[in-house]
């Protein structure tokens, strides 16, 4: 029997501003929620609140590429130069390597964070990301990123190892739009959100019902608003609710939408680091992915052996130490199931 008491107790202990659910193949087994989606409007954060997923969005970008591969619209082992000749190292890299974070392409967010940190030395990473990503919401912004990446060598030889880089999935999202002649949001809606009845899920952080906040200022008890933004890149722009993410978790557990071969590819971890939108969880035997954009945080852990998924959304960081402690206790709880 799943220890739902222990699950609730850990969440009560840390009082995260957000909500979390435990899901099996058919039902939401348990949920917990606390705090505000919007402090100014006094709107509580619930399992129906839409919030930014950040890099958890990469699962959908990866699966979109896999759908197009199955349909013969692209090839995973084709060189990136086939789809993005403007990138100077594109002839050395394949889409498969990008999906596995094994391309060596530097992380554009790290490059831009370093630049903005000198302009805003007292700002948190959450706050710094706002002006960076706000400037990248259209084709001109994407081309600026490619121009920036063209100024830097690869971090390592392709397929040498796996190292996390948002650039891979920003570019993959762009390739989807180029091949399909659809916006990424329309493609996701047609192939994922509508078939799974994920009616509260959209591409574009501007659609989040929850506002995003920096760490709570405990000196005066006031919140520091970061905002929703309007980011739409393939590396981290989906917004969703826990009710909809339960449907996504169940689709993964049932292996819907993709072919059996495509699911096998997506879930295979390479270089002991990354699958295609999946990583090894802190809990042995589980898979996971997290996400962070502006003040939004997301955590997704799933076990095929247990046929369970745990998903959490926050719109304000409890602070790095509290977040790590909560993650560690939750990982230990999952391991004991």
Q: In which residue ranges do the predicted regions lie?
A:
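Short beta-strand scaffold segments in enzyme catalytic cores
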Residues: 19-22, 279, 300-301
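Short, well-ordered beta-strand elements
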Residues: 30-32, 64, 299-317
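Short, surface-exposed loop or secondary-structure junction motifs
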Residues: 31, 91-294, 298
